[in-house]
Amino acid sequence: MGEVLARSSRLVLLLGVLVAAVSALAAPGVASARVTPLPAPYRVVVVDRMSDAAFAAVARRGAVGLMRPGFGPTTSYGSALAELVRGAEVNSHIGGMPPGKPLIGPDKVRGSWVATWCRMCIVLQLPPRGGTLLNDKLYRVAIVGRGYHGLLVSPTTHIPGLVSIVDIAPTALGRPSTGLSWVGASNAVGHLDSLGQQIHANNRLKYAALFIAAALLLLLALLGLRAAATAVPAALLVNLGLGAAQVSNEIVLVAGISIGTALLAFALARVCRSDDALLMLYGGVVFLYAATMVSRPEWQAINPFGPTQNSRFWGIGNQVETLLLAPLLAGAVLARRRFGLLGFLLFGLFGLVVMTDNRLGSDGGGAIVLGVALAVLGWRLFRLRLSGFIGLLGAAAVTVLWLVQRGLAQQGPDHLRSAFSGGVSGFLASLASRWPLSYLPALHAWMLVAPLLLVLVAVFVAAWRRTEVQATRDLLLALGVGLGVSLLVNDSAAYELAGGIAVVGAVARFVPTAAPVRLRVRVPLFRRAEPVASESPPS
């Protein structure tokens, strides 16, 4: 008995250390390799083209990067120019002018010769004049003066070499807190060529990668293999490995997501045979993503499940958010069964910090989804009354709001600033934007969204009917509610549905082996009364 208690206390301590470590990762820090220039005004020059020779020449004199000219699936010369001069964005699904007045007045020059001799200048390309274009091309940008040399580093993208168009105006005005900095590079042009190929290849495979993962996890679940319970962590680990290896070959990417995930899932299933091992696997994968988002955000961002690099550049996108629901919710179930209420609360807090904090996931929609799912899960696991569910939901909301306000208090870009910095009006405007950003695109893509929705419902019903394990049903219910909320608050329905198929298939084979600990503290106000067995009178 003493050995069991000591082991339990060590695992509780490990959960506490995990939460503390993630909180430390989320604390503001300074990247010593990045160099911030002194404030100074720059001349901004828009060229109609920039040849390879001119780009190589300016790279020897300054710092260079690749620039995304807009936000959303489409762009144009007019919208890119409007965002350039204002240093503000507007999603192409919404349209119209970005907020604010023009801050800079760029010069327009034909040819790229100006880049070879200018001083104190920012030279960049924009999309060609004409109609609307797909926002799938990166354009060259260079800065000369004030010691700039190497790769441009953007506070908006968090990816060395990748620049957003909203970074140009604050840089030109000499605002170091929101402008571009740089990091040294021996072959900046070669690095940018590789970066562009990597972004292009991974963006082409966003749907394919999720469909492959969903099919693989469904197959493992249908075959009744325990590897289904470790397949989502395996897919997330392979995805992160492909990002760290900076793979740009599409054949290798597909092979990694399919064959690599299957092999790793079977290997993890052999190693993680106990609930404690699964708990450490689920928590370890999430912690690894958190550490990567702080130390090497480009590894987590540029991979098959990463953001699309045309509206969200870093943090947790809808694909990874949906896949993370499996280890976060299943881990919360195991933490509750192993350590009771304390374990559930610590693991839930750990997940909310990773999902919400601005230096980590910075995913407001994901925070809402996870908070609601955790409240439903706790309500079911602890057999609470409705008041208990409301209490858990309120606790999750307070935690998320505290993390959001903590991020808003720091300088620099924040994915959640537009929704929360404007008070009630800003939040209402964010809710109103769900129609053009979420629901209208889903209606336009109904031929893809409708079949995925039908498959997800069928998989969920089959999983629910095939299991009689109460913990699995509790997990399925929380996951189903979370996916429903995700469709309401997020803006990529097809990604969420495909990812949902994958995680429901995995959760269907999740069966805890250890008996849950008994709760020593009872709160009658929140807990449902246990049924009392009646005794029949002796005959």
Where are each of the predicted segments found?
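Juxtamembrane membrane-water interface segments that cap and precede transmembrane helices
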Residues: 189-201, 298-322, 423-447
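Alpha-helical transmembrane segments of polytopic membrane proteins
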Residues: 203-215, 248-265, 308-327, 364-374, ...
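Core alpha-helical transmembrane segments of integral membrane proteins
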Residues: 193-308, 318-337
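Aromatic-rich transmembrane-lumenal/periplasmic boundary elements in polytopic membrane proteins
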Residues: 276-295, 301-303, 391-426
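Soluble extramembrane regions of membrane proteins in the secretory/endomembrane system
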Residues: 29-200
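Membrane-interface helix caps and helix-loop-helix hairpins in membrane proteins
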Residues: 244-250, 355-364, 488-495
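Membrane-interfacial entry segments at the cytosolic side of transmembrane helices
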Residues: 272-281, 339-342, 382-394, 471
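Membrane-interface helix-loop-helix junctions at transmembrane boundaries of multi-pass membrane enzymes
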Residues: 340-341, 462-476
